[in-house]
Amino acid sequence: MRRDGIQAAVLQPVTRSRARERVIREAAVADAWAALWVSRALVWAAGVTAAALWGLSARVTLFDPGAVTRPFGPAGNALVAPLARWDSVWYLAIANDGYPPGDARRAAFFPLYPLLVRTADTVVRSPIAAGALVSFACFAVALVVLHRLTELELGAPAARIAVWAIALFPGAVFFSAVYSEALYLALSIGCVYSARTGRWAWAGALGALGAATRSAGVLLVVPLAVMWLAQADGRPRRVRDAAWIALVPAGLAAFCGALALGGGDAFAPMHAQDIWYRHFAGPFVGVWEGTAAAWRGLHDLGEPAARADVVLFGFLVATVPMVIAVLRRLPAAYGAYVLAALALPLSYPVGPQPLMSLPRFVAVLFPLFMMLGAWLAEGSRLRRAAVLAPSAAGLAIVSAVVSTWHWFA
């Protein structure tokens, strides 16, 4: 359903001919394929070049004492530099030996992605290669489904640009790294697309997998519930469809149950947030704390942490108009999901750096990029270049920063 600035109260059923469906599918694959390879080539080239020219920060020995992200020797390690940094250490550790009861920090990292990495590792015999392959494949799927969903809601031109917008977003560096972002992106888009096209069993199953991938995954209940209430196909809403929605929290419940059966704390995923310095400050109070941190940072730009506060605030400012556009132009389910997902990091800020990880939270909020694609499609080539070129430059810079073991997000 094409939305031209007016928010409909209900969702219309999807009807298409087979020929039309085939054309749309082929366009989605072609556009996604191009965005995937160009963006990943940019990430790899920038990251490898930076690691080769400038080497690694001394932090590598502190945050990766076991050298799990650099097992190949100098040349090989440089080639995989953009793939395994920072949280990759945790995912690789979990893929190797799970969740020991004595290490509560690991419970902040949900199990589905490391489980897939461990499974792939039995074939490729390299945890880093396994993690990168899982992420790369998931990102490819995510781009195709994002194209399909955006075309459905906003039209083909918006879909074509939306996949480029998300692939070139600076936070997209993690979509091909040993991180769970690509898996969660694929599952969350697939979940919403399934519900949008009336496949409620698929929506519930993918939502449950999303809830086993990230702490925010359980919030996929929100868009599904709103979509169920907003159906307009002339039939009474089916209780069976709502029952599939109730499957979503099962992913989180399974994780908690597995921890308890292993002798650990069933509520460790919730308690782990305290270990990583997240605290409840009040609904969206993180916006104020992040603004204050950025203001202080402007007066102390010589400090890396201060500069990071300013950069993170810039991401927050850039996100606001996209959120407003989603609320105005997309069906209510998308806006509800975006607000619920942003409420987590912005209501539970990190003490030392309130907006920490915000670019990663934003990167997986696909409705934002759907609307960015629509806005760019409606404008001139100059508008598109003015947005996508700096975004690509930012992606290259972030790739260089992360690959040399300097912190981003």
Predicted features and spans:
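Membrane-lumen/periplasm interface segments of specific transmembrane helices
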Residues: 42-60, 83, 210, 221-322, ...
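Loop-to-helix entry region of an early transmembrane alpha helix in multi-pass inner-membrane enzymes
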Residues: 107-111, 115, 123-141, 304-313
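Transmembrane-helix motifs of polytopic, lipid-linked glycan transferases
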Residues: 119, 133-153, 318-325
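Transmembrane-helix signature of polytopic, membrane-embedded enzymes
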Residues: 129-130, 146-168, 186, 332, ...
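Specific aromatic-rich, kink-prone transmembrane helix
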Residues: 145, 165-168, 183-202, 221, ...
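Short acidic/glycine- and proline-prone juxtamembrane loop motifs at membrane-interface regions
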Residues: 177-183, 358
